[in-house]
Regions:
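Membrane-penetrating hydrophobic segments
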Residues: 1-9
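Cell-wall polysaccharide-cleaving catalytic domain and substrate-binding groove, primarily
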Residues: 11-159
Length: 159
């Protein structure tokens, strides 16, 4: 029960555990909402692990970051590659993080560098290892270095 109470406090107040201790409300909104990719709210998406109502008016809130990575895995693999046929990091990032809100070139270049390929090379997101690395790199661009590759891998495993 104390763990549940602490989880509610973290979610509601935006308490972020950092190496230097606890800071109230200083973590990025995606961290406060357990949404490492800042996935936008959409009434049509009934994600497993989704918290309703969201603590953020624009972005989804998840019970744990692994559920946010899970949603990202499904979004990239099933929608972006499966439905839309996006084959490169550049194509995926330009849809996920459009240039009217982001520096999409820098975003795509960073993600590609983390995967060791060019941003305009085809990428196979049916590979769990590749998908987890991509999601982890995207989380760094979205919220900073708050999450581990292992958390992204768990989200992919759950997808």
């Amino acid at each position: 029960m104390p763990v549940l109470i602490a989880a509610v406090i973290v979610l509601v107040l935006g308490v972020a555990m950092k190496a230097g201790g606890i800071s109230i409300g200083s973590a990025p909104r995606g961290v406060r909402a357990n949404n490492p990719l800042n996935i936008e709210s959409n009434a049509n998406n009934n994600w497993v692990g989704k918290v309703s109502p969201s603590v953020d008016s624009r972005f989804e809130t998840f019970r744990a970051p692994e559920y946010g990575f899970r949603a990202g895995a499904i979004l990239l693999r099933d929608s972006y590659q499966g439905r839309y046929g996006l084959e490169t990091i550049e194509e995926i990032i330009y849809k996920f993080a459009p240039s009217h809100e982001n520096d999409s070139d820098n975003y795509a270049s960073f993600v590609a560098s983390q995967l060791g390929i060019n941003a305009n090379e085809p990428i196979n997101l049916s590979s769990d290892a590749t998908l987890a690395k991509m999601l982890h790199a995207m989380s760094v661009m979205e919220v900073g270095r708050y999450y581990s590759l292992e958390q992204a891998q768990e989200g992919v495993r759950m997808a």
